[in-house]
């Protein structure tokens, strides 16, 4: 996982451009051509699904991601990572070698906006 860019300061107006929503992980697959990546299929509400590529393999078991509610950066420009399209990014915290996926404290519907 990338380290936070501590020296970068963004305005509140810039921050508001990022859309954070809740998604539910429907499927976790090993990336076909990368040892440290998973390919996730995520329900983002409104009958829509997105594919995310996440650098969690080897740090978080797939079984701990499957079915989980996650926080998704929903409006990032899509990227292709090692041949797989990623249409957003899940949020996680890193403390040394420990990675924790950010999740809501209670059950909320996919597509719910994080504010």
Question: What is each stretch, according to the model?
Answer:
Residues 1-115:
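Phosphate-backbone binding interfaces of nucleic-acid-interacting proteins
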């Amino acid at each position: 996982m990338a380290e936070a860019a501590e020296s970068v300061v963004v305005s509140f107006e810039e921050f508001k451009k990022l859309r954070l929503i809740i998604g539910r992980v429907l499927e976790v697959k090993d990336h076909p051509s990368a040892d440290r990546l998973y390919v996730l299929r995520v329900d983002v509400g409104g009958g829509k699904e997105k594919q995310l590529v996440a650098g969690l393999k080897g740090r978080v078991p797939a079984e701990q991601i499957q079915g989980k509610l996650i926080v998704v950066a929903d409006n990032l420009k899509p990227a292709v990572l090692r041949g797989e399209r990623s249409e957003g990014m899940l949020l996680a915290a890193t403390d040394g070698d420990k990675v924790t996926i950010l999740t809501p404290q209670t059950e909320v519907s996919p597509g719910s906006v994080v504010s």
